[in-house]
UniProtKB/Swiss-Prot annotation:
Pfam families: Complex1_30kDa (PF00329). The keyword Membrane applies. Belongs to the complex I 30 kDa subunit family. NDH is composed of at least 16 different subunits, 5 of which are encoded in the nucleus. It comes from Calycanthus floridus var. glaucus (Eastern sweetshrub). This is NAD(P)H-quinone oxidoreductase subunit J, chloroplastic.
Length: 158
């Protein structure tokens, strides 16, 4: 079964993979990193003008990294929002995904957190730098293959 956005993307020849619906009935799509920016723009034009949240996770040790976007479209009133979940998978060695900051400003801190914790580089993000960890921190703490240091010093903690 296809959702509205998936059917619209198929109708216009845009490559994606439907992952079905979650337990709340939200359509979930998989998009390739190289197709993500154009599909994000199209989604915005189609009416998904609110990025509810963005997060990222490590699929498996040595596996892919995923960036997840929940988009909301309010067409018939705030009590009937239409939502879609889009997952963009990137290779672990050099994870690059186009930033959607220029489409949805709310992606700013969320993409920075995903970069800081998992090392996903969001291309064309205006301020992509660590947001939670010190700039001197080595590694990506939420990766499943991350080895925590035996000792680290917290400086200037008051």
């Amino acid at each position: 079964m296809q959702g509205r956005l998936s059917a619209w993307l198929v109708k216009h020849g845009l490559v994606h993979r439907s992952l079905g619906f979650d337990y709340q009935g939200i359509e979930t799509l998989q998009i390739k990193p190289e197709d993500w920016y154009s599909i994000a723009v199209i989604s915005y034009v189609y009416g998904y003008n609110y990025l509810r949240f963005q997060c990222a996770y490590d699929v498996a040790p040595g596996g892919l990294l995923a960036s997840v976007y929940y988009l909301t479209r309010i067409q018939y009133g705030v009590d009937q929002p239409e939502e879609v979940c889009i997952k963009v998978f990137a290779p672990r060695r050099n994870p690059k995904i186009p930033s959607v900051f220029w489409i949805w400003k709310s992606a700013d801190f969320q993409e920075r957190e995903s970069y800081d914790m998992l090392g996903i580089s969001y291309e064309n993000h205006p301020r992509l730098k660590r947001i939670l960890m010190p700039e001197s921190w080595i590694g990506w703490p939420l990766r499943k293959d991350y080895i925590a240091p035996n000792f680290y010093e917290i400086q200037d903690a008051h």
